[in-house]
Amino acid sequence: EVLLARGPADALALNRRYHDAATHARYAPQGDMARELYEAMETARCEAMGARDMPGTAGNIDVKIKHEALRRGYDQAKQASDVPLSVAAGYMVRHMATGRPLPAGAENAMELWRGFIEDQAGGTLEGIDGSLADQADFARLARKMISDLGYGDQLGDDPDSQDDEQEDQAEEGSEEEQDPDSTGQDDQDEEEAEGTQRLSQE
């Protein structure tokens, strides 16, 4: 019971340590299924970071995962439809990021979806280890994986593309300020030249 109580407490502490709400919101998908996948993967990232940096938390998180998996009946699941894809994806991210075996119920849930996930997003999953410590980089990977799994239409606009557009607009605005319309100056120069010519003729 002590370990069971420590698991959720550690999970909350790891979320506070490794999770930035603004970054999370920035890359969050719009659709329900895509968002569930995104949330599950980010939770797994935080827990995996904790397991790496503070190994003592790993066992407590394992107990939490085991309890949740058994409570939801994942140990008795017989087919993929018995387990939400988002849950299995989160388990797989944690397993691949830490190398730790999952508790039995969670292991069963992951294995039911493993073939599908690896077939659709195996190449993207290979980048997990390198992006784990950078939440924004991991969020981009998560969005790519969501697209791989067939939910790209639920992602919404790419926040990085929006930033590029804003930067381009800012640069254009800056160039216009630095290079103002010279028509007015040209007209003034012409008028001054004409005036000088009239004076010389007089």
What is the meaning of each model-derived region?
Residues 1-202:
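Short, functionally important secondary-structure microenvironments
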